[in-house]
Amino acid sequence: ILNKKIWGVYEHHPLHNKLPIIRGFDDKFYVPHSRNTGVDGEAIRKNKELTIVAESDETGPYIILNSTGSQVFVTGHPEYDPDTLDKEYHRDLAKGGDCVMPKNYYKNDDVNDEILVKWRSHAYLLFSNWLNYYVYQNTPYNLDDLLKMKTTNK
């Protein structure tokens, strides 16, 4: 558990440009985060079964793959709608207490200004790559073959 909540829209960068999961990603891309827990990047790096594919200097590992590519772990929220962090911010304000505005989210860091949606194209590309390269292309046409694959991989 972190001392301070990570939330806002953060810059990320790919670490392994040749992997299909990040095909087409920009050198820098943005992803929303909203969490009170950290991710131990050093522990992940020491695990030979896992690879950090993309990360942020501020939030740590973002996309992590297992060695076979059958598991993809994403620590941010690329699926967020444009107003998700705004709703969360106003909800937390209504509860009272110490509430900090989400980072890099509102234009000019002004809650009354527009929301800057910088993650949409990245989100579509991430989900498209995952479905195409890790689900569709790895699922056999004959579903009986899929059952055989599952029983032999145990």
Positions of predicted regions on the chain:
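Amide-donor transfer/coupling interface in amidating biosynthetic enzymes
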Residues: 7-154
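Catalytic helix-loop patch of NAD(P)-dependent Rossmann-fold dehydrogenases
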Residues: 4
